[in-house]
């Protein structure tokens, strides 16, 4: 039985699985305190919450606080992944077909997770390896801290510059930063100073703060190197979600990924999955970024 090559809308259950797999490859998704929401564009009204309770004497006049609401518009972007395989897959038995297709979808879901970090942190297209026009990179808008030779002091400096309006509930580490922190030991005992530092995307902790590690933090595909070591702050300020309608199609003809090779001519078919992200950074002052001294950027120390 040949595969159906029409463009199909993935069922809600499958779309939800792909969305959750994005959490396994994105530090932003991993550190977000809430589940990803499936939505299109969204306007956020930022509520500053500066009111304080007033002590009122018997019969005294009561005063109010006028709240200012600042709108932040979500930024929407479309993502796609295309994977070429041998056209013989169309005629494979059902078990083999299911296994291979599942691996393709898992690989594409992982790519969709990584692209979230690349767009939000760096305004960068990881496939084309180009800067995205019209996007504001968090690496440039967050409060900058220049790294020193003392990584413990660097963590303290990051925490100091985050606006005191916000809680610190997450830190995203580059692999370089995570490895350096794991090497720090208490001189008197030899124990690790940060024993729960993660070396992968499984959330660990640093000083009680949820932590995740990935090459997307520094943007390993970006040249020249960004020099970014970590982002720390209130990750609830990064609102993101994926559209529920995730499309997948099997393409038999043409050159859908612009490789210069026609699918029929090389006996291949292509799997393509498309989705739509939307995100907004409510206040970049609630997040700090640690950069090596050689990288450019403003310093808040």
Question: At which residue positions do the language-model features occur?
Answer:
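Assembly/oligomerization interface modules of large self-assembling protein complexes
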Residues: 2-82, 286
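Short, Lys/Arg-rich flexible segments
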Residues: 2-30, 88-95, 113-120, 126, ...
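Extended, solvent-exposed, turn-rich assembly/linker loops in the middle of proteins
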Residues: 129-205, 209
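Structured loops at beta-to-helix junctions and adjacent beta-edge loops in soluble globular domains
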Residues: 47-49, 86, 174-176, 214, ...
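Sequence/fold signature of self-assembling virion shell proteins
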Residues: 4-6, 94, 187-301
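Short helix/loop capping segments that flank catalytic or ligand/cofactor-binding pockets
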Residues: 53-55, 93, 180-183, 280-282
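Alpha-helical scaffold segments that mediate packing/assembly in large oligomeric complexes
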Residues: 84-164, 289-301
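Short loop/turn segments at secondary-structure transitions that flank enzyme active sites
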Residues: 50, 89, 114, 177-179, ...
């Amino acid at each position: 039985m040949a595969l159906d090559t029409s463009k199909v809308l993935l069922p809600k259950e499958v779309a939800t699985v792909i969305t959750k797999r994005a959490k396994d490859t994105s530090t932003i998704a991993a550190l977000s305190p809430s589940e990803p929401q499936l939505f299109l564009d969204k306007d956020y009204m930022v509520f500053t919450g500066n009111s304080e309770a007033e002590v009122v004497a018997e019969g005294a006049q009561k005063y109010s606080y006028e709240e200012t609401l600042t709108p932040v518009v979500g930024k929407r972007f479309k993502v796609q992944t295309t994977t070429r395989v041998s056209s013989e897959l169309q005629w494979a038995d059902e078990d083999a077909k299911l296994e291979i297709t599942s691996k393709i979808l898992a690989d594409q879901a992982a790519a969709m997770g990584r692209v979230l970090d690349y767009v939000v942190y760096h305004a960068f297209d990881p496939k084309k390896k180009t800067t995205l026009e019209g996007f504001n990179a968090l690496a440039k808008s967050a409060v900058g801290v220049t790294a020193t030779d003392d990584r413990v002091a660097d963590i303290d400096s990051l925490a100091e510059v985050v606006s005191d309006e916000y809680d610190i509930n997450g830190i995203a580490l580059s692999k370089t930063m995570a490895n350096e922190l794991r090497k720090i030991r208490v001189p008197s005992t030899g124990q690790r100073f940060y024993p729960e530092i993660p070396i992968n995307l499984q959330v660990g902790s640093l000083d009680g703060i949820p932590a995740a590690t990935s090459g997307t933090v520094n943007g390993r595909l970006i040249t020249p190197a960004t020099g970014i070591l970590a982002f720390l702050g209130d990750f609830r300020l990064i609102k993101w979600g994926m559209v529920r309608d995730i499309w997948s199609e099997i393409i038999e003809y043409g050159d859908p990924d612009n490789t210069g090779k026609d699918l029929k001519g090389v006996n291949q078919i292509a799997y393509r999955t498309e989705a739509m992200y939307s995100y907004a950074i409510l206040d970049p002052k609630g997040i700090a970024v640690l950069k090596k001294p050689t990288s450019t950027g403003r310093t808040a120390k």
